[in-house]
């Protein structure tokens, strides 16, 4: 597994620290925007989109990704984009939901490391949260994340527990976030419903906090979409519900 690779010597980045020890992107002072821009340019992102990413890196002091690694993610109704060697052509191929998720989460992990934007990845059933971008660790934390993504999914969907833990994190950061006019970004990758309680009730304490929530669905199942839309309609949250890349493209085309 990638996490067993030799540890690199980590050089601490001077970021603000919350009471629970989590580092914050304090007004973007510690970001490596040049390296982030180079990373995105190599992926052939246009300058306008790169500028949008840079703006978001400043806006969000901390990023949290909840990653659904439950057994249902092994279903083979996902989609993935495969590009040609020269990056000029791409095609959609069918894959497991987990493969679709893993490709996207890997990208966010790489961006967090390249930009040194403090980011936390929380797998529903496996291990402890992985922090990327809080120190210049030679890519060790990114390797751990990639190793987790190479494992097979299995287990249930305890979203409520993780949402409650994230709420405590945001509450611990609230004073500094408001002082800096920043927010926390929370993205939930999932293909279903919570298995450990009322998710709307778990999300409700986030109301009024400086946090934006994105639900990234890894399925086009109508019942799952209805479930999440119902939650959204009953909460006063900054919340967006997104289908896969191709579904979003079809909506705006």
Each PLM stretch: what is its role?
Residues 13-90:
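Acidic, polar low-complexity linker/tail segments
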Residues 3-26, 50-60, 221, 226-253:
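P/S/T/G-enriched low-complexity
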Residues 58-61, 96, 114-119, 154, ...:
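Eukaryote-biased feature marking scaffold/signaling PDZ-domain proteins and nuclear chromatin regulators
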Residues 74-76, 110-122, 132-133, 175-179, ...:
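Intrinsically disordered, low-complexity regions enriched in proline, serine, glycine
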Residues 52-57, 110-115, 168-180, 204-205:
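Surface-exposed acidic, glycine-flexible loop patches that form ligand/cofactor-binding
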Residues 57-183, 185-189, 194-196, 218-226:
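Von Willebrand factor
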Residues 77, 154-157, 192-235, 242:
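VWA/integrin I-like adhesion module and closely mimicked acidic/polar interface patches used
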């Amino acid at each position: 597994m990638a996490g067993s690779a030799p540890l690199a010597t980590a050089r601490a980045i001077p970021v603000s620290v919350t009471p629970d020890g989590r580092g914050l992107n304090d007004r973007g002072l510690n970001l490596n925007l040049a390296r982030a821009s180079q990373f995105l340019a190599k992926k052939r992102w246009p300058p306008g989109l790169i500028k949008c990413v840079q703006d978001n890196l400043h806006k969000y002091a901390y990023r949290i990704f909840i990653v659904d690694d439950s057994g249902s993610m092994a279903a083979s109704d996902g989609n993935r984009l495969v590009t040609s060697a020269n990056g000029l052509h791409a095609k959609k191929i069918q894959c497991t939901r987990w493969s679709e998720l893993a490709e996207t989460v890997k990208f966010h992990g790489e961006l967090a490391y390249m930009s040194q934007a403090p980011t936390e990845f929380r797998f529903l059933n496996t291990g402890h949260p992985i922090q990327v971008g809080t120190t210049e660790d030679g890519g060790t934390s990114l390797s751990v994340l990639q190793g987790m993504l190479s494992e097979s999914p299995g287990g249930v969907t305890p979203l409520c527990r993780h949402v409650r833990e994230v709420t405590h994190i945001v509450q611990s950061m609230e004073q500094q976030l408001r002082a800096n006019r920043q927010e926390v970004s929370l993205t939930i990758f999932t293909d279903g419903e919570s298995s450990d309680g009322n998710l709307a009730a778990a999300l409700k304490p986030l109301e009024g906090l400086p946090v934006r929530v994105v639900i990234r669905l890894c399925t086009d199942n109508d019942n799952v979409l209805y479930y999440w839309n119902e939650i959204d309609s009953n909460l006063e949250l900054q919340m967006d519900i997104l289908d896969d890349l191709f579904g979003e493209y079809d909506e705006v085309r």
